[in-house]
């Protein structure tokens, strides 16, 4: 129900909450000047204007057991096990939406003389033809980047983090408290995310490899979770940046195929959802109108 930022301004005892519920009357009155002139030295902005910080500090839920499904007292998001969520979505799409799911390897991509992608030649299922191709191939950007040659625009001059080490931390006891907010703790060369799930915590260190070695990063992560060493951590290398455009010809990239800045999961999911909704809502009735849709999509998403 919030994001808690620890030690981002000062290296000790500095905490700021970004609550998901806006202060009462926030769209009508700006409370910032009053906070600055009256209470800034004694408490943070979120503490002064929102009750949600108190819910988080007390480990309370944003709703009660008496609330109906999706009925809330305070706004909240979901902490999900990504692997289980993918399985759920796949089953739902196949059984309820009639989607044909093909798991295969793309061996060759064929194009028309105008540059449009005509089909994907797969290893086990042969040619897969379509009018529109959505590139969800991850950072490789197989269709938009490798095939249609849309250049990558690096952002490493302002986003210094380029490496992440992620691990899973089980709860010691089944009754251990589960944080009802995401915790983001600043470190010397980056920041650590800490997300409480039902059966475990997802913890990872995002850092700049120019300012921290992998060995140092692992030690920092181990110290954070209270272990001598982290043995099962997964290392992820990434280059912050994005494709120059996200839609070219009859191919549109969504998610990592379009770009990646930092493992800011909520922001990334929002962009994926916004992209999918736009494609579904604005899908042109014929290929002749696709350039107009692509131009609008690129203007909005970039």
Indicate residue ranges for each PLM-predicted region:
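Short, glycine/charge-rich beta-strand/loop segments that flank catalytic centers
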Residues: 2-8, 106-107, 235-239
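Conserved FAD/dinucleotide-binding core of flavoprotein oxidoreductases
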Residues: 186-237, 257-273, 282, 290
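Residue-level marker for buried hydrophobic side chains located in beta-strands
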Residues: 251-253
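Dinucleotide-binding Rossmann-like beta1-alpha1 core, especially the glycine-rich loop
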Residues: 1-58
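Extended charged low-complexity segments that act as oligomerization/scaffolding linkers
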Residues: 2-9, 175, 224, 282
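Active-site-proximal substrate-binding core of FAD-dependent oxidoreductases
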Residues: 278-302
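Predominantly flavin-linked oxidoreductase catalytic cores and closely associated redox partners
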Residues: 67-222, 276
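Single, function-defining residue in the core of a domain
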Residues: 218-221, 243-248
């Amino acid at each position: 129900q919030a994001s808690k930022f620890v030690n981002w301004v000062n290296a000790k005892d500095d905490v700021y909450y970004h609550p998901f519920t806006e202060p009462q009357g926030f769209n009508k009155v700006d409370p910032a000047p009053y906070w600055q002139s009256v209470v800034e030295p004694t408490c943070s902005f979120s503490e002064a204007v929102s009750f949600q910080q108190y819910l988080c500090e007390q480990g309370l839920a944003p709703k009660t057991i008496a609330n109906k499904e999706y009925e809330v007292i305070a706004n909240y998001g979901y902490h999900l096990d990504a692997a289980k969520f993918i399985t759920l979505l796949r089953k739902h799409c196949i059984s309820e939406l009639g989607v044909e799911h093909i798991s295969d390897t793309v061996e060759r991509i064929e194009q028309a003389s105008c540059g449009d992608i005509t089909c994907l030649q797969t290893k086990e299922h042969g040619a897969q033809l379509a009018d529109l191709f959505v590139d969800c191939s991850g950072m490789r950007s197989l269709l938009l980047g490798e095939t249609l040659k849309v250049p990558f625009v690096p952002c490493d001059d302002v986003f210094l983090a380029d490496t992440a080490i992620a691990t899973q931390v089980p709860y010691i006891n089944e009754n251990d408290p589960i944080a009802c907010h995401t915790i983001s703790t600043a470190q010397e060369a980056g920041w650590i995310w800490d997300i409480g799930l039902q059966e475990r915590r997802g913890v990872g260190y995002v850092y700049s490899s120019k300012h921290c070695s992998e060995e140092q990063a692992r030690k920092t992560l181990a110290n954070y979770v209270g272990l001598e060493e982290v043995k099962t951590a997964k290392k992820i290398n990434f280059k912050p940046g994005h494709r120059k455009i996200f839609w070219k010809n009859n191919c549109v990239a969504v998610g990592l195929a379009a770009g990646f800045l930092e493992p800011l999961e909520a922001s990334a999911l929002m962009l994926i959802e916004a992209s999918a909704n736009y494609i579904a809502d604005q899908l042109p009735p014929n290929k002749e109108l696709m350039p107009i849709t692509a131009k609008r999509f690129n203007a909005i998403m970039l």
